[in-house]
């Protein structure tokens, strides 16, 4: 199995990136490839999960081991496949997600694409108590899932508004990491204005 890839980041797409290793280009599917955009044409070390099916072999890539570990736990949950796990990781703060699981916060979990109440309950049933042994969660983070779900809803609404204005999925994904990096509590209007300013650069 391929645990990580180290090479030159050659290109980015909407769902994947390509890393050149000794003249061979490895396509790696990521939650949001544009979190790596500042490393384009530079050396990159990316954690990978080698997913083998009867009809395909796919490399999934992650920013760090924590993100990779959470991916492996998510795909162990009944009803969540690799695509569903990636959709969750694309919009989640790991500590906030774990706090939501521990708090049995259905509202937070159903804020992710493709996660209904039944799947949210299954996530809680399968993962509660199993993530805190690996990830340390503070009391403050334990209480923070309400603000996190509000942030997720803000980002989601802002991204849909940008698409309605004619921006492509690729352009929207490019600005999302910059919005999240500031970690500010924004209204939808503020998030849209900030995203438009970034897109205008």
Swiss-Prot record:
Transmembrane residue ranges: none
Keyword DNA repair: yes
Subunit composition and interactions: Homotetramer. Forms an RuvA(8)-RuvB(12)-Holliday junction (HJ) complex. HJ DNA is sandwiched between 2 RuvA tetramers; dsDNA enters through RuvA and exits via RuvB. An RuvB hexamer assembles on each DNA strand where it exits the tetramer. Each RuvB hexamer is contacted by two RuvA subunits (via domain III) on 2 adjacent RuvB subunits; this complex drives branch migration. In the full resolvosome a probable DNA-RuvA(4)-RuvB(12)-RuvC(2) complex forms which resolves the HJ.
Cited InterPro entries: DNA_helicase_Holl-junc_RuvA_I, Hlx-hairpin-Hlx_DNA-bd_motif, NA-bd_OB-fold, RuvA, RuvA_2-like, RuvA_C, RuvA_C_sf
GO annotations of cellular component type: cytoplasm; Holliday junction helicase complex; Holliday junction resolvase complex
Free-text function comment from the UniProt entry: The RuvA-RuvB-RuvC complex processes Holliday junction (HJ) DNA during genetic recombination and DNA repair, while the RuvA-RuvB complex plays an important role in the rescue of blocked DNA replication forks via replication fork reversal (RFR). RuvA specifically binds to HJ cruciform DNA, conferring on it an open structure. The RuvB hexamer acts as an ATP-dependent pump, pulling dsDNA into and through the RuvAB complex. HJ branch migration allows RuvC to scan DNA until it finds its consensus sequence, where it cleaves and resolves the cruciform DNA.
Stated name of the protein: Holliday junction branch migration complex subunit RuvA
Gene label: ruvA
Keywords: Cytoplasm, DNA damage, DNA recombination, DNA repair, DNA-binding
Chain positions covered by the region annotation Domain I: 1-63
